[in-house]
């Protein structure tokens, strides 16, 4: 393993190096061991993301929580913190626990269709680069079409889970590319 690849993976911020390096040391006893663990994880993630998509359509919060818990543990065992953190959100939101006080900014429903990631805007403290706003200001020019469900609504929790899932997928894609480079 080249030092450059090792350093690049460490610098990526995608991996808790203390955890991942323990797994890599097992390659000394069995060549390719860590890579095989990553390959199994990739398969698990792909299957579980499909299950999560199904449970989102069904609005099955219990199964969503269980799937989030499963992936959280698998990701954490490999030191894949970005994925693990988002899966922890899925797990907690499935139990209707907003442990990180995540706020929905706005949900616009399309007719009778279920809330989906395409029509959810969330406020996670980021500012709009176009106008510098953080999305909390109200405009006198637009009508208030806000349809933000409260925490008693399953749609609220589904929207939070969809946000966490989108971020978990992004973290997975980034981690997969970084690990593919590492193992080349």
Curated annotation (Swiss-Prot):
A single BP term in Gene Ontology: osmosensory signaling via phosphorelay pathway
SUPFAM superfamilies: Histidine-containing phosphotransfer domain, HPT domain
Pfam families registered for this protein in UniProt: Hpt
Function of the protein: Phosphorelay intermediate protein that is part of the bifurcated SLN1-YPD1-SKN7/SSK1 two-component regulatory system, which controls activity of the HOG1 pathway and gene expression in response to oxidative stress and probably to changes in the osmolarity of the extracellular environment. Catalyzes the phosphoryl group transfer from the membrane-bound histidine kinase SLN1 to two distinct response regulators SSK1 and SKN7.
Protein name: Phosphorelay intermediate protein YPD1
Any Gene Ontology CC annotation: nucleus
Subcellular location: Cytoplasm; Nucleus
Record gene name: YPD1
Alphabetical UniProt keywords: Cytoplasm, Nucleus, Phosphoprotein, Stress response, Two-component regulatory system
InterPro entries for the chain: AHP1-5/YPD1, HPT_dom_sf, Sig_transdc_His_kin_Hpt_dom
Biased segments, Low complexity type: 125-147
Residues found modified as Phosphohistidine: 69
Region ranges (Disordered): 120-152
GO molecular function: histidine phosphotransfer kinase activity; protein histidine kinase binding; transferase activity, transferring phosphorus-containing groups
Gene3D superfamilies: HPT domain (1.20.120.160)
Organism listed in the record: Candida albicans (strain SC5314 / ATCC MYA-2876) (Yeast)
Family note: Belongs to the YPD1 family.
Domain HPt: 30-125
């Amino acid at each position: 393993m080249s030092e450059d690849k090792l350093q690049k993976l460490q610098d990526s911020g995608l991996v808790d190096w203390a955890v991942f390096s323990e797994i890599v040391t097992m390659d000394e006893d069995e060549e390719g061991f860590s890579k095989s663990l990553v390959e199994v994880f990739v398969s698990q993630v792909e299957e579980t993301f499909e299950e999560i998509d199904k449970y989102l359509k069904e609005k099955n919060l219990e199964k969503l929580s269980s799937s989030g818990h499963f992936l959280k543990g698998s990701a954490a065992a490999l030191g894949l913190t970005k994925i693990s953190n988002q899966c922890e959100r899925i797990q907690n939101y499935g139990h209707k626990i907003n442990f990180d006080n995540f706020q929905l900014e706005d949900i616009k429903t399309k007719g009778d269709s279920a809330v989906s990631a395409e029509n959810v805007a969330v406020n996670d403290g980021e500012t709009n680069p176009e106008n510098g706003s953080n999305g909390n200001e109200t405009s006198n020019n637009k009508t208030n079409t806000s349809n933000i469900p409260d925490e008693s609504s399953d749609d609220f929790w589904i929207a939070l889970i969809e946000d966490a899932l989108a971020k978990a997928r992004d973290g997975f894609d980034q981690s997969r590319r970084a690990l593919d480079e590492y193992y080349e």
